[in-house]
Swiss-Prot record:
Phosphoserine: residues bearing it: S159, S363, S560, S651, S655, S660, S662
Activity regulation, short description: Allosteric activation by glucose-6-phosphate, and phosphorylation by a cAMP-dependent kinase.
Family: Belongs to the glycosyltransferase 3 family.
Other comments on record: Present with 6300 molecules/cell in log phase SD medium.
EC number, as in UniProt: 2.4.1.11
Function: Glycogen synthase participates in the glycogen biosynthetic process along with glycogenin and glycogen branching enzyme. Extends the primer composed of a few glucose units formed by glycogenin by adding new glucose units to it. In this context, glycogen synthase transfers the glycosyl residue from UDP-Glc to the non-reducing end of alpha-1,4-glucan.
Example GO biological process: glycogen biosynthetic process
Domain of life: Eukaryota
Annotated signal sequence range: none
GO molecular-function term, one example from the UniProt record: alpha-1,4-glucan glucosyltransferase (UDP-glucose donor) activity
Name of the protein: Glycogen [starch] synthase isoform 1
Length: 708
């Protein structure tokens, strides 16, 4: 019986399903609404059960209740019953996010007694070794086998639907070679969000990674770092998948050389873009959140607060504490050069640079807490005195011209300000003073290893100590932000909105959600041409015009380290010297780019990847279904095509709009898009069910900006 390609089932597999660890969690969570709108109950996520977090992430459902499953999905219920009878424990329910997709979380401890048997089977089938004490690899093997068990049962019981399994990262990759070896009738897609070797080699910081990709002895490099078995899993997954994809052009280049298979396409990461009805709304949000950051800055720099907040800009870098990979080293060095330039030029501008990277700490410093309390106490006292003065002015004006009052308004300061209030105000003001020679701290927490912390050591090296003469001030906040923070009570998104510029000079960043999030919120950012996001935007926007849209791209691939640092310092200085009006206009342009990052657009790339998988797995059936002639030569190749870039913006750029007959490829680089390369516009009729509108209308967006 032929499987139904149009009404197929989709299972997405990852270790970060309902389990926040890194960026894949954000990808799955933000993509879910679009995927659920497209697939409905035919979409299920599979992953390992994290007992510590699942109860707050998942609404459990009674999977034994037949009403939970539509009739055509009863094979899934029967498979779960069979696995439960054989001792496999799991949680079935709805993920508590927008779209509420169905999830199956397998308890790996319930199958751990199979570990040695499955390891032996993995060696005999695929030849992949697995050391005994690598717990992460052990869990990857358990997850791979239990997923293959599940998919194998479902494919046997359900002969009517085509089944697609989409696997993210090597931790979910064990299942791919097993599906191939065990001949399970499932279309497989593997997406690598970062290669193992790439992350290890770049973290070392002593190699020109991207310009030497073709020269690495991958087996030797993996062996030297003790990850050869993990590398084997990753490489086997890439080679046995029907469709192999990465998240960016730069990662595709990396995967081609390190994993020895050229990716079939690119699946860029998107975001759920919330559009405002009017431009001024997000500008007002910026002003509100900036005021909260101002409150923190007043407290942190009390006693040395000699700069004008209206003439101050806020820069920040945020992410995992990967000192070199995330470009923290380059950021600090560029800040030191910027500080020198501003001092030499006599600039009145001040830069406050935040580093938001979690490190091991004991607690907030007493000084950080005390500083905020001192300023808050002054603010409360001033508010109380102000209220009293207002009341006295009101009483005075009410009594005039009676009681011998000669003026409509009080003219005697003593009449307005009582002596007790003067004393209280003086005490509060004197409390602001710091001991002689004491400077505002550069870190807000007590570090567990202050002496060996790379960020603090570099700050000491470049002598950015928050001296009064410094035009660049530095604050290292070694903890992710949240609204319950006692010194900087903002969630991360609120903090980003309040800042002026995000700086992310990463050296190894397969995609880069942080600059993408900045773009969606209308905050200009600095990225690099070796980050996925930077390469993506560089491909869409004319290189010399990207900064007009608030996207500054530093060259870390073809310039020397010193030249890259100088370029970053140039970009930051250029931004500092902008007027307030110029910054507002730039934020408007930046926010308009957000449509290019919406999952409603990016989700199409996933549709195309599934299409290519179905074409390869069922070529003749697919040809009959869509009624087209596809040559064998075009079946497994992705053609290039003419690409257009966004031109220089006008002072008030128009809204993005799709042009008819456009051949713009949303996937950057040489690989092209899966859909365009296979002339597969018909697939929208087969798969999206109207969830993703592909019509040309005023609400659609593309790589074009038209003047309205």
């Amino acid at each position: 019986m032929a499987r139904d390609l149009q009404n197929h089932l989709l299972f997405e597999v990852a270790t970060e399903v309902t389990n926040r660890v890194g960026g894949i969690y954000s990808v799955l969570k933000s993509k879910a609404p679009v995927t659920v709108a497209q697939y409905g109950d035919n979409y299920t996520l599979l992953g390992p059960l994290n007992k510590a977090t699942y109860e707050s992430e998942v609404e459990k459902l009674d999977w034994e209740d037949e009403s939970i499953f539509p009739e055509e999905l009863l094979p899934i219920q029967k498979t779960l019953m069979s696995m439960r009878e054989k001792g496999v424990n799991f949680v079935y329910g709805n993920w508590l996010i927008e779209g509420a997709p169905r999830v199956i979380l397998f308890e790996l401890d319930s199958v751990r007694h199979f570990l040695n048997e499955w390891k032996a089977d993995l060696w005999s089938l695929v030849g992949i070794p697995s050391p005994e004490h690598d717990h992460e690899t052990n869990d990857a093997i358990l997850l791979g086998y239990v997923v293959v068990w599940f998919l194998g049962e479902v494919s046997k019981l359900d002969s009517s639907h085509a089944i697609i399994g989409h696997f993210h990262e090597w931790l979910a990759g064990v299942a791919l070679p097993l599906c191939r070896k065990k001949r399970i009738d499932v279309v497989t897609i593997f997406t690598t969000h970062a290669t193992l070797l790439g992350r290890y080699l770049c973290a070392a910081g002593d190699v020109d990674f991207y310009n030497n990709l073709q020269y690495f002895d991958v087996d030797q490099e993996a062996g030297k770092r003790g990850i050869y078995h993990r590398y084997c899993i990753e490489r086997a997954a890439a080679h046995t998948a029907d469709v192999f994809t990465t998240v960016s052009q730069i990662t595709a280049l990396e995967a081609e050389h390190l994993l020895k298979r050229k990716p079939d396409g690119i699946l860029p990461n998107g975001l759920n873009v919330v559009k405002f009805q009017a431009v001024h709304e997000f500008q007002n949000l910026h002003a509100l959140k900036k005021d909260k950051i101002n409150d923190f800055v007043r407290g942190h720099f009390h006693g040395c607060f000699d700069f004008d907040l209206d003439n101050t800009v806020y820069f920040f870098i945020a992410g995992r504490y990967e000192y070199k990979n995330k470009g923290a080293d380059m950021f600090i060095e560029s800040l030191a050069r910027l500080n020198y330039r501003l001092k030499v030029s006599g600039s009145k501008k001040t830069v406050v640079a935040f580093l938001i990277m979690p490190a091991k700490t004991n607690s907030f410093t007493v000084e950080a807490l005390k500083s905020q309390a001192i300023v808050k106490s002054l603010e409360n006292t001033v508010n109380e005195v102000t209220a009293s003065i207002g009341k006295r002015i009101f009483e005075h004006t009410m009594r005039y011209p009676h009681n011998g009052l000669e003026s409509e308004l009080p003219t005697n300061l003593d009449e307005l300000l009582k002596s007790s209030e003067k004393v209280l105000l003086k005490k509060r003001v004197l409390a602001l003073r710091r001991p002689y020679g004491e400077l505002p701290p550069v870190v807000t927490h007590n570090m567990c290893d202050d002496a060996n912390d790379p960020i603090l050591n570099q700050i000491r090296h470049v002598r950015l100590f928050n001296d009064s003469s410094d035009r660049v001030k530095v604050i290292f906040h070694p903890e992710f932000l949240n609204a319950n923070n006692p010194i900087l009570g903002l969630d991360y998104d609120e903090f980003v909105r309040g800042c002026h510029l995000g700086v992310f000079p990463s050296y190894y960043e397969p995609w880069g959600y942080t600059p993408a999030e900045c773009t969606v919120m209308g905050v200009p950012s600095i990225t690099t041409n070796v980050s996925g996001f930077g390469a993506y935007m560089e491909d869409l926007i004319e290189t010399d015009q990207a900064k007009d849209y608030g996207i500054y791209i530093v060259d870390r691939r073809f310039k020397s380290p010193d030249e890259s640092v100088e370029q970053l310092a140039d970009y930051m200085e250029e931004f500092v010297n902008k007027t307030r009006r110029q910054r507002i206009n730039q934020r408007n342009r930046t926010e308009r780019l957000s449509d290019l990052l919406d999952w409603k657009r990016m989700g199409l790339e996933y549709v195309k990847a599934r299409q290519l998988g179905l074409r390869r797995a069922y070529p003749e059936q697919f040809k009959q279904l869509v009624g087209e002639t596809i040559s064998d030569a075009n079946m497994n190749t992705l053609a290039g095509g003419k690409k257009f870039k966004i031109a220089r913006p006008l002072s008030v750029p128009g809204s993005p709009k799709v042009r008819s007959n456009s051949t713009v490829y949303m996937t950057p680089g040489d690989l092209g898009t899966l859909q365009d390369a296979n002339n597969a516009d018909d697939y929208f009729n087969l798969s999206t069910n109207g969830a993703i509108d592909n019509d040309d209308d005023d609400n659609d967006t593309s790589a074009y900006y038209e003047d309205n």
